[in-house]
UniProtKB/Swiss-Prot annotation:
Residues 99-115 have a biased composition (Basic and acidic residues). It comes from Arabidopsis thaliana. Residues 67-124, 158-366 form a coiled coil. GO terms for cellular component: cytoplasm; microtubule; nucleus; plasma membrane. The lineage of its organism: Eukaryota, Viridiplantae, Streptophyta, Embryophyta, Tracheophyta. Belongs to the ICR family. This is Interactor of constitutive active ROPs 5. The gene is ICR5. GO terms for biological process: cortical microtubule organization; plant-type cell wall organization. Expressed in xylem cells in the roots and in stamens, petals and pollen. It comes from the Eukaryota. Component of the active ARAC10-IRC5-KIN13A complex. Homooligomer. Interacts (via C-terminus) with ARAC4, ARAC10, ARAC11 and (via N-terminus) with KIN13A (via C-terminus), but no interactions with SEC3A. PANTHER family: INTERACTOR OF CONSTITUTIVE ACTIVE ROPS 2, CHLOROPLASTIC-RELATED (PTHR34224), INTERACTOR OF CONSTITUTIVE ACTIVE ROPS 5 (PTHR34224:SF13). Residues 1-49, 99-122 are annotated as: Disordered. InterPro entries: ICR. ROP effector binding specifically activated ROPs and linking them to the microtubule cytoskeleton. Involved in ROP-regulated polar growth. Involved in local disassembly of cortical microtubules when associated with ARAC10 and KIN13A and conversely also mediates the elimination of ARAC10 from the plasma membrane by the cortical microtubules. Accumulates at the plus end of shrinking microtubules. Targets KIN13A to microtubules.
Amino acid sequence: MQTPKSRPGSLELPQKKSPLPAPKVVRRLKPSGAESDPKTKTISKTQIPKVVADRRSARIPLNEIQKKRTGRIPELESTISQLQEELKKAKEELNRSEALKREAQEEAEDAKHQLMDINASEDSRIEELRKLSQERDKTWQSELEAMQRQHGMDSTALSSAINEVQKLKSKLFESESELEQSKYEVRSLEKLVRQLEEERVNSRDSSSSMEVEELKEAMNLSRQEITQLKSAVEAAETRYQEEYIQSTLQIRSAYEQTEAVKSRYSQREAELTEELNRTKDEIEGLRKELMEKVKEDESTGDLKKLESDLMEVRGSLMDKEMELQILRSAMEKKVETANTEAMEAELKRVKIQCEQWRKAAETAASILNNDEERTDSIETSKMLKKFGVLLKKNHK
């Protein structure tokens, strides 16, 4: 009767084997459990081999096996619930890690888009700077050409003024020589008149009335010639004064033109210097932006492009500095050549020389007036004829 009871017990073994597959679940969930809590390793290592050992031990009776199983069922259930909780925690952590991963990916995409926008804005900024530098170069070139043309016109005007001054100086010398010659003629005629008057006084006692009449006529002619020569001398002096005033006015206008050109060149030089400083500041800002972009972005192609743009702007800056230096040196040369102080000193020297000549002529006239030599009537008539011829030539 006991044997049939043992069979149902043997038949119950497959029914009570349902808790045994739990260790298989534990083996499948071993990685997640290992990541979440190290206690699962101890549970799986300590409990599962015992169950397997109890299962494999065929020598133990079925009643003991059933008792052991009924005693281990709560433990297995507790371990299963613990493992389920750990699995739930692992799933939650996995979900959190996936959410963090998605957030990190979204942030990376946003950063990538922002970097692309920054690159596009930097490219547009560099293109705008390049266009501005090209336009500035064109304006500078046109302004330099205009200044060169104006400088050429000013130099031609200055050279023409200098030529006019030279012509006036030569005319001044001619008029002074004519003035000295006319003064000499006047003095000689006055001397001749005095001689004739003395001869007339001496010839009162003579009986020749014809000679007296001739001498009177000669005296009248000499007086007329003296008045004509005096008027010619006065006209020469007035012409000399007018030409001197005109030459001084022209020199003053040339000096004012030179000062105006000099001030205009200095003003333009200051403007170009300010423009160059502004361009240098822009280049420094571009260099700083380039360094920041190099730190943020490691793309070598954009870096080379920016460096080439920077070198082009720097080369254009050097060209403008060279043009400014050339313009400055040309301006200094023109100002040195157009120095009117030398011309004023020359005119003063000529004036002083004319005064010296005039004083020398006056002293010579005084010496001639003090001379008491007499000439014959024939020589006086010849001298009068010569002075008449000279006077006619002067009138012609």
